[in-house]
Amino acid sequence: MSKVIGIDLGTTNSCVAVMEGSEPTVIPNAEGKRTTPSVIAFVEGGEIKVGDPAKRQAVTNPTKTISSIKRFMGNKYSESSREAGRVPYTVKKGDNDTPRVEIDGRLYTPQELSAMVLQKMKKTAEDYLGQDVTEAVITVPAYFNDSQRHATKEAGEIAGLKVRRIINEPTAAALAYGLDKKSQDQKIAVYDLGGGTFDISILELGDGVFEVLSTNGDTHLGGDDFDEVLIDYLADNFKKAEDIDLRKDPMALQRLKEAAEKAKIELSSSSQTEINLPYVTATSSGPKHLVETISRSKFEQLAAELVTRSMEPVKKALSDAGLSKSDIDEVILVGGSTRIPKIQEEVEAFFGKKPSKGVNPDEVVAIGAAIQGGVLTGDVKDVLLLDVTPLSLGIETMGGVNTKLIESNTTIPTKKSQTFSTAADNQPSVEIHVLQGERPMATDNKTIGRFHLDGIPPSPRGTPQIEVTFDIDANGIIKVSATDKATGKSQDIRIEASSGLTEEEIEKMKKEAEANADADKQTKEKVDKLNEADAMIFQTEKQLKEFGDKISEDKKKPVEEALEELKKAYETKELDQITPALDKINEAWKTASEEMYKAQAEAQGGANGQPGGPQQGATGAEGGDAKSGDDVEDVDFEEVK
């Protein structure tokens, strides 16, 4: 049976894990690392690189290297202007007000780009397991809205994965933490500060039940923002000194981003760090260099507002769960940004206890997703996960009011109905405007869909009975229906296009992703064949040089001719010329090999001081030329390595 893999699709890094027996295993990628940078690069020749190879070439190719694409997932272009101004690549407005990344004149959706990262994760798992992988559990920030969840699901589909479950990142972390503590009753807080998003979830664990009591967060707060304060500090100082804004030069901005990220990481273990960027830009007076020393205390001053911002959702989540700080038994830190000492200090000061160091903040979410995959396949028993919807759901009613049907932090799956009526006499239809958010007025919340119920019989206002039903599945994805009780006529909407993509667009992107995968496979096959040809040329020349005089001319000549043919074919880099040339040299080699190996055996025998010794006897026996065993003398010899 096919395995269900768990994928943590992160803003900065991604990770994949799978259940092996009763234990979750994090799978290292082709580069040998357990996490993969969520970076995609479009390089010359049409090749697409993902992960470390993409990140390594970012400085020289900043406008075609895509990072932090998760910040655009499921958002409108009009909501993403701040993020768009912070990245070196070009973000434009697409259909349905969706953000699109422009590469060589083509517009890519965030879902397509995320799918490329997911394809890398899928391939990593397939190489490790030795079988095709078609199903996955993918994690999202707990505070992702319906559009962002849909966009993530679509990215999975484009990557060729059936997304069995969308699971909240803090919930996944709690699963990983609590799998071996199922018998203990405890309340835990999961503080999850990743590269682009922040979540806090309060959970209750006991008897194998993982129940989310409340969740809160900020989908625009993460490690990128901590990098940004350093980038602004460095760029502002450089502008004061040189009157040049490095943020306007994509290559300089990319170097600043990498330097800021490195400095942030170093300041987690050092009291100060030096940023040294030679030749960061140039003017008519010559090259300019950026050299700056930053102390940890300076970084903490710059990031103070961000740290404070993260604590507000924590207070709200505790309040929504009806708990006080002292009720929390354990605090778990998730996400690479929780390595920042100031974050750890603030969390410890708030809860009055040291956070648990028992989980790896970079891997724990993927491990939890793999466990959920195991629950779905039946490999993991006695675990029940009860998650919640992060935001309230409602519809717009008379006066532009947001009337909530399902409150935030309601356990899912759930279903709720409420009856409404018309606002005018003889109203033939009603528009159902579906909203997600906590604000009292409709305009202040996120629209996740609209649909109409037609054919209402003419009657005075307030007479028709329109029943509106919200149905949220275990993925947190919403279906809304409206029924006229008098006629039984109904209309429903599964909020599919809330991410801005139609089914046709998703299908088209799936086909393109498959084509890219085929192209990648062909590229690898070509590289392998070129390497094989190169190795064959080297080995043939070496063998002819060493043992050519031991081979008769009639057998050596076909090898030399085939070698020349292979060299010419190798220069063309065309497989249809290299493959037959390789076949030809292999065939020519076969006929010459008997004399070649015989010569080689004699040379080795000579090296051991025993011409015609045991090696020759062994080779002769293989070739059928040796005499009976009576003529073979047993000798002791030392293998020369």
Curated annotation (Swiss-Prot):
Region spans: Disordered: 596-641
Q: Which PROSITE patterns match?
A: HSP70_1 (PS00297), HSP70_2 (PS00329), HSP70_3 (PS01036)
Modified positions (Phosphothreonine) are 197
Q: Give GO MF terms, alphabetically.
A: ATP binding; ATP-dependent protein folding chaperone; unfolded protein binding
Reported induction:
By stress conditions e.g. heat shock.
Alphabetical UniProt keywords: ATP-binding, Chaperone, Nucleotide-binding, Phosphoprotein, Stress response
Residue spans of biased composition, Acidic residues class? 631-641
According to the UniProt entry, which residue ranges have a biased composition of type Gly residues?
Answer: 606-623
The record's listing under SUPFAM superfamilies reads:
Actin-like ATPase domain, Heat shock protein 70kD (HSP70), C-terminal subdomain, Heat shock protein 70kD (HSP70), peptide-binding domain
Listed NCBIfam families: PRK00290.1 (NF001413), PRK05183.1 (NF003520), prok_dnaK (TIGR02350)
What the record says about family reads: Belongs to the heat shock protein 70 family.
Function per UniProt: Acts as a chaperone.
Its recorded name reads Chaperone protein DnaK
- Name of the gene encoding the protein in the UniProt record: dnaK
